[in-house]
C-alpha cells in the first residue's frame, strides 16, 4: 500500500521542483521517500502517516528549546493578535537587538533580516563597502547561504548532490572568491601575502557544520584574526548555525576570538524566519540610512518572528540550560560511539554544545578531505535503519545534527538502544 508520505511526495514533484523547497529535504543523498511532517512537539516529530520520530534535525538547528515550546507558541500568538506585519519599526525589534548586543561579545550594532542567506550576503556587501576591496576568502565545504559569490565549493546541500559549486553563478562573480582549505592556516597566510591588498573579508563557519561537524584546529581562528588585523581585512564569523547553539556566546565566546562581523539565524528566530548581522560600530554605521551600503527588507524585523526569537533567547538564559543541553548531546555521541565500537563498525562522533557530528570513519574529521573520505554508503544504511526505528537524523552525511533541551536522558537511551541493533546488523 502506498504511504501518505509517498503520495504527498508524488504530488509535490508535480508543482515544486524536486518536490521540496530546500534540496537536502528530498533524500536524494540517502535515497528513499522524504518524510512529510504533520506536527512536532518537544523532541519528536510525526510524519504524514502518523509515525513518531525522536528528532535530531530540529528544523536544521532553530528548535533548540524543542518543538512547539509553550513560551514561544504563546509569544507568537500574542504578537499575531497585535498584527502580522507593520513595515515600520516596533519596540520588539529594539528589544531583540539590545539582547543580541548584550549576549554576543563582538556585536555593538545589529541589523535584522529574514534569513541566514540575507545575513551573510549583506555582511559581504558591507565588508566590501567598508574596505573598498572586492575579493572574499571562504573555505571549501563551508556553506554561507545561496548568494552567488558564496556558492563556490560550498558544502552542505551542494555536496549532497555531488556538485561542489552551483550552476548559474557567473564566472565574473566567482573570480572574486578565493577558496581555501579549512584548518590550513599556512594556505591562508600564502593567499594574504599574494593578494592581501585585494581582500575585503574572510568569512568562515568558525565551527563548520555544513560538511558535517568539523572543529577548528588550535591556532586556526587565532591566525585568521591576526592576519585580518594585519591586512585590514574584515573577519566575518558565520554563526548562523552555531550562534547560541554551541554556547551562550557562540563560537566567539567559546574560543575568545572577536570577529569584526557576525552573521546569525536559526536559534534567534525560535523557528520563525529571522537572520541578523552585526559587529563593530564603525563598520555597521556604513549601512543605509547612515552610510552608502544599501540593505533593506519588507519583512525584516517581522513582529511575529521577532516575538518568537525573543522568547527563544530568554529561554536560553535560564540557569543550567547549556549545561543540560551539552550533557544530553555528550550522552548521545558517547553512546553511539560505544555501540558502534562494540559491533566492530568503523565510526566516530563529536559534539559541541547542542550540535553533533557522526562519521563513518576511524577518526573525527579535521578537514574537508577527511569528511569526503568517510564511508557514505555506511551512513546511508545507518540513516534508513534508524529512520525505520523511529529516530530522525539529518538525511545527508554532510550535515551536523542537533539536540534540544526537550530531549531527555530516556530519549537518548532509546536512540542508543536502536543504534546498537542497527550497528549489529551493519557490522
Curated annotation (Swiss-Prot):
Gene3D superfamilies: Aspartate Aminotransferase, domain 1, Type I PLP-dependent aspartate aminotransferase-like (Major domain)
Co-factor requirement: pyridoxal 5'-phosphate
Enzyme Commission number(s) from the entry: 5.4.3.8
GO cellular component: a single term: cytoplasm
Pathway assignment: Porphyrin-containing compound metabolism; protoporphyrin-IX biosynthesis; 5-aminolevulinate from L-glutamyl-tRNA(Glu): step 2/2
Keywords on record: Cytoplasm, Isomerase, Porphyrin biosynthesis, Pyridoxal phosphate
Modified residues (N6-(pyridoxal phosphate)lysine): 266
GO molecular function: glutamate-1-semialdehyde 2,1-aminomutase activity; pyridoxal phosphate binding; transaminase activity
SUPFAM superfamilies linked: PLP-dependent transferases
Enzyme class: isomerase
Swiss-Prot/TrEMBL GO biological process terms: protoporphyrinogen IX biosynthetic process
Compartment(s) of residence: Cytoplasm
Domain of life (superkingdom): Bacteria
PROSITE patterns found in the cross-reference section: AA_TRANSFER_CLASS_3 (PS00600)
Catalyzed reaction equations: (S)-4-amino-5-oxopentanoate = 5-aminolevulinate
Matches recorded under HAMAP family: HemL_aminotrans_3 (MF_00375)
Assembly mode: Homodimer.
Stated family: Belongs to the class-III pyridoxal-phosphate-dependent aminotransferase family. HemL subfamily.
Protein's UniProt name: Glutamate-1-semialdehyde 2,1-aminomutase
Organism lineage: Bacteria, Pseudomonadati, Pseudomonadota, Betaproteobacteria, Rhodocyclales
Amino acid at each position: 500500500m502506498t504511504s501518505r508520505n509517498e503520495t504527498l511526495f508524488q504530488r509535490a514533484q508535480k508543482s515544486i521542483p524536486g518536490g521540496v523547497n530546500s534540496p537536502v529535504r528530498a533524500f536524494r543523498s540517502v535515497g528513499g521517500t522524504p518524510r512529510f511532517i504533520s506536527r512536532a512537539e518537544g523532541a519528536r516529530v510525526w510524519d504524514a502517516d502518523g509515525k513518531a520520530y525522536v528528532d535530531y534535525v530540529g528544523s536544521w538547528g532553530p528548535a533548540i528549546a524543542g518543538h512547539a515550546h509553550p513560551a514561544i507558541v504563546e509569544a507568537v500568538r500574542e504578537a499575531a493578535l497585535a498584527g502580522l506585519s507593520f513595515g515600520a519599526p516596533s519596540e520588539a525589534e529594539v528589544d531583540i537587538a539590545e539582547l543580541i548586543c548584550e549576549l554576543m561579545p563582538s556585536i555593538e550594532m545589529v541589523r535584522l533580516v529574514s534569513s541566514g542567506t540575507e545575513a551573510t550576503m549583506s555582511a559581504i556587501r558591507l565588508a566590501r563597502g567598508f574596505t573598498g576591496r572586492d575579493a572574499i576568502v571562504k573555505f571549501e565545504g563551508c556553506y554561507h547561504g545561496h548568494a552567488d559569490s558564496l556558492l563556490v565549493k560550498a558544502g552542505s546541500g551542494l555536496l549532497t548532490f555531488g556538485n561542489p559549486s552551483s550552476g548559474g553563478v557567473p564566472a565574473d562573480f566567482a573570480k572574486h572568491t578565493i577558496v581555501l582549505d579549512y584548518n590550513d592556516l599556512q594556505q591562508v597566510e600564502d593567499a594574504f601575502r599574494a593578494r592581501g591588498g585585494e581582500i575585503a573579508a574572510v568569512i568562515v563557519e568558525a565551527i563548520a557544520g555544513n560538511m558535517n561537524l568539523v572543529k577548528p584546529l588550535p591556532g586556526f581562528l587565532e591566525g585568521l584574526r591576526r592576519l585580518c588585523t594585519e591586512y585590514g581585512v574584515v573577519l566575518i564569523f558565520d554563526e548562523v548555525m552555531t550562534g547560541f547553539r554551541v554556547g551562550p556566546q557562540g563560537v566567539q565566546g567559546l574560543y575568545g576570538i572577536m570577529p569584526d562581523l557576525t552573521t546569525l539565524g536559526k536559534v534567534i528566530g525560535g523557528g520563525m524566519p529571522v537572520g541578523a548581522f552585526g559587529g563593530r560600530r564603525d563598520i555597521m554605521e556604513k549601512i543605509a540610512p547612515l552610510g552608502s551600503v544599501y540593505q533593506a527588507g519588507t519583512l525584516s524585523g517581522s513582529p511575529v518572528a521577532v516575538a518568537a526569537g525573543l522568547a527563544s533567547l530568554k529561554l536560553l538564559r535560564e540557569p543550567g540550560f547549556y549545561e543540560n543541553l551539552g550533557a544530553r548531546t555528550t550522552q548521545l555521541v558517547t553512546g553511539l560511539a560505544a555501540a558502534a565500537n562494540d559491533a566492530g563498525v568503523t565510526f566516530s562522533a563529536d559534539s559541541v554544545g547542542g550540535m553533533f557530528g557522526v562519521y563513518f570513519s576511524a577518526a573525527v574529521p579535521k578537514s574537508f578531505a577527511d569528511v569526503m573520505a568517510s564511508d557514505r554508503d555506511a551512513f546511508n544504511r545507518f540513516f534508513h535503519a534508524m529512520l525505520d526505528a523511529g529516530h530522525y537524523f539529518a538525511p545527508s552525511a554532510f550535515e551536523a545534527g542537533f539536540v534540544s533541551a526537550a530531549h531527555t536522558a530516556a530519549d537518548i537511551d532509546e536512540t542508543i538502544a536502536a543504534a546498537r541493533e542497527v550497528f549489529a546488523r551493519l557490522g
